Amino acid sequence: ENTMSELKVSIADAENAKRTVPELPSKTSDIISATKMLKEPIDYSSFIDAIKEKQSALENSILQMRQITAPTESFVIQRIADVEGISGVQAVTEDHDPNGNLNKAGGYTACIYFSSSLINQDEVFGNDIVEKGTDCGGCIEGYPTIEEAEKRNTYLSAFDGAGMLDSGSHNILGSIVIRTSRTLTATQQSELTQKISEKLLELQ
């Protein structure tokens, strides 16, 4: 919305800067003066550059929104695999899903758990990353719509600060819920979430 508004403002500025042709003066001297003024060139380059810049920003914003709305499993894995601090990734399947929500009504269409190098994996129970769950690092849940992601985020909020039931940090990016382990510090959670967000938004 902001990029669209900024583009509209730039277009309006350019419209306001356009030279208007005045009514024909009655006096010859006034006609000569008006003619000289109209012959003077106007530099519209700054307005054109501003419009191009805002248009490019809008186009990029649209592309980014497409990336983070109902993302595919392969897209998420490809992006987060290179995030600093993530040591491994594993996607859930319908046969191997702790929550049993994959592809169900109201559930996620992609769910990728990841391990963090900041956490001692030997101290987290489970045979693989999915079994260890968010405790070993975190999870990326992709939903068909933003509304479904928000509903999931609200549900997770009910467990904030609930000790062993605390599900860690959870933030929305488009129709994605980015979760990080409760065993990480608040700063580590925030930094990891930021790095993941940047990778998911990156235009390649």
Model-derived regions: residue spans:
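Amphipathic alpha-helical assembly segments used for oligomerization, scaffolding, or translocation
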Residues: E1-T69
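Sec/Tat-exported extracytoplasmic proteins
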Residues: K18, P25, I32, Q55-L58, ...
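Arginine residue identity/basic-tract feature
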Residues: R19, R66, R79, R152, ...
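Soluble non-cytosolic domains of exported or imported proteins
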Residues: S45, Q67-S74, T183-S190
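Extracytoplasmic/secreted envelope proteins and their assembly/folding machinery
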Residues: I48, E73, I77-I80, E150-N153, ...
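Surface-exposed beta-loop interaction hotspot
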Residues: L63-V83
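Short, solvent-exposed recognition patches
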Residues: V76-G163
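A short, solvent-exposed beta-edge/loop patch
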Residues: I129-T134, C139, N153-Q204
